[in-house]
Amino acid sequence: MIQNKKVTICACASRSFVNKDKVAEIAAILRNEEYAVTVIPDLCEKVMQASPEITEIASSLIIACYPRAIRSHLHRLNLVAENILDIRNSGSDEILGQLQIKPCSDKENIPGKESIRKEIDAFPVESGTDAWYPVIDKDRCTECGRCRDFCLFGVYTSENRQIKVAQPQNCKNNCPACARMCPSKAIIFPKYEKSPVNGGLDEEEHFAPEEMDAMYRERLKMRLAQRKAGVSLLKNQ
């Protein structure tokens, strides 16, 4: 499955849905199997900042959340990730099994696990201020522009009839409203708790078309009032 034996694991340090002990276990076992493993605190942040190492990350095996979310993340930077495993919903034995690696029966005494866990625990926890922004699944997006019309924070723009996430840092933390409005369910917030908004394929959250239309009309009224009042909701303004 993976040729260069390079692995990137996202610990999602500021959120609780990725089990940190599971991250340490998998990282330790892979290192003991001579994989070059890097554990990062927040893949979302690295993509948002277009970090210099993101190209190398994309070429590695990425162990993070839903594959659809990760692919859409990297597409924003014109990168393609070929190998992605879901640590958010898969157990450590399942992930190791996909790499043809035998799990360890004594999970508490895996060589190197304790030091990796300390490394993870030292990552900064940015509750309420961690990277939170939408990514677009271009396989689903119809470029209708509803998200751009709906958003009050200037996150989206349209260039050559293509919707883009232009100002991810402007997004309001923990607000997935635009994703709920998307008729094709193309907008993903990887850190949201329910599918399909978080990139999952299940329908854990559903809104009827009439509810979506009502929310859309109400938001357009708010945008109009905002413009008339000359009020900006953008951060740092």
Give the label of every model feature segment.
Residues 1-5, 168-237:
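Flanking helices and flexible, charged tails adjoining ferredoxin-like Fe-S electron-transfer domains
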Residues 39-41, 137, 211:
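Helix N-cap / beta->alpha transition motif
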Residues 122-143, 154-180, 189-198:
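Ferredoxin-like iron-sulfur electron-transfer modules
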Residues 92-95, 144, 217:
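Short alpha-helical interface patches
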Residues 1-131:
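Iron-sulfur-associated redox domains of electron-transfer enzymes in respiratory
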Residues 12-16, 46-47, 60, 65-69, ...:
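Local cysteine-cluster metal-coordination motifs and their immediate loop/turn environment
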Residues 30, 51, 75, 80-81, ...:
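Alpha-helix boundary/interfacial micro-motifs
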